[in-house]
Amino acid sequence: MPLNDLLQNRRSTRRFRPDAPIDRAELNALISQANRASSSNNAQPWRIMVLTDPALRQRLLPEAYGQEQIITASAVLVLLGDRAAYREPNLRRIHQQEFADDCFDANVRDFLIQAAVQFYQPFDETDTQRGLALDCGLWAMAFMLAAEAAGW
């Protein structure tokens, strides 16, 4: 489906068919696609919990403002923002992997690590929460578009 059609037709699903559970392999593929989402300095600060256990979803219900789709969906994804993703060890790991994948040379790698560390260094808790909300929101949109493109 063309991107424009995906964007024009995207809707927030409120009702789920109990006779159409999502296969775990297909769900994992959608998560993998969403993991390619853009993020600030490629920090990739999202962590995903997949809840299929009805008892766990029942416990989550009050935190989700009683939305019945927490119970009726075949799986619930809990999207968490990892504050440690904006710290030097993760930034170094990410850019080292990009270097190993031959995305750029060592000089660019070193520059990107230094620039990212300097960018996040002055972040207070509010800045960190805003960054996580933005980056995790990009992941969520990528996931929704991938799911829509797959017919969900």
Can you say where each PLM-predicted feature lies in the sequence?
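Acidic, surface-exposed loops and disordered segments
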Residues: M1-W152
